[in-house]
Amino acid sequence: MTVLALVLTTMGLQAQNWPEWRGPAANGIAEQGNYPVVFSATDDVLWKVKMPGKGGSTPIVWKDRIVLTSGVGEDTDGEDGVLCYNWEGKLLWQTKLGNQLPGKHRRGSGSNPSVVTNGERLFVFFKSSTAAALDFEGKILWKTNLMEEYGEISYFWDLGSSPVLAGNNVVFAVMHEGASYLLALDQVTGKVAWKADRNYECKAETAQSYSTPLVVGEGGRTTLVVWGADHLTGHNAETGKMIWSYSGFNPTQRPYWRTIASPAVSEGIAVVPFGRGMHLAGMKCIGSGNMTGEDFLWEKKGIGADVATPIASNGKVYVVGHTGTVWCVDLYTGNELWKNEELVGNGAFFSSPTLAGNKLYVCNEEGDLYVCEVSTSGIKILNHTKFDDNFVSTPVLVRDRMLLRGTKNLYCIGN
């Protein structure tokens, strides 16, 4: 079996950066560090700053800068904004990019996609379909609007797919009930490098995908792995051409099977949550041509995540369900190693978890934050803290600190 490794989006990434939504290797795994474990909503909170509007994006970190997107103001009067802070919580700059398209979901916003950086430029995407590049002083280098260029985007809910970097391009995924596509723009100029149509016939709402592509490397080739519309597809990152595809996720063509959680990829295996959190499947992320459910390595019913993206590490997959159930399954077989239902709360677990060593950080929409120790035999809750806030973004663990973006505030927690 050819082994795939998640491609670092920037050559020479420094260990203590968090350049995109799911971290240094885009897999939800933090670099080794002495991260906070025991704390409260007040103790060890080094600082917190009030957000100027709604946003569900995860902060990114590059050197001494913390950057995130947010609405500036509310509803139709608000604007798409990019905010930059230092490690003392001081706002260094704020750049507005035009009128926002407000969120529809109670926890949604016009600023759900996270920033991605190559260390020189910041790339952003909003529900308004504005895509832009900025420098680290907040200057807009280029800006475009995908709806103006390619037609209306008809998501039922709120745009959730974050941009990713592949080679010299930044890639955006637009998967909805209209004409769907992948778009690669040159990082420097913003000009179109390629555009690849991605359309499938689906029942109501099923064509809509809020997942983020993954960039993986295999045999000297960089592949974009894309999940949505009942298909997992692999595309040549240089051209957008489809290399392989998997169908078979929805053989009875059920409606409303939109996809939110992104796949996890480890050791050449893609782990895909589907069926509104009721199914999980593993398949090889290599090859060519069209494959079906018969080509899955495994498929499990009753295990899955609707919104939170799983983590695959060291032959194990950690899955956080909608109500807080945590599963650990074998990467190669899908067999359940353990299941835990101790994480409780009044809200849904929309936030994707973060793994640091053997510590799993999990939070929910009603402000519950759990730090758990995971092992081959199970999970142990080390800390449960309740914040007066709402969490849908991913906990960021970097430089021995945790950044936590809530609806109300951005928190920095450390020892």
Regions found by a protein language model. Name each.
Residues M1-T10:
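Bacterial N-terminal signal peptides
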Residues A15-N415:
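Noncatalytic, solvent-exposed loop/strand surfaces
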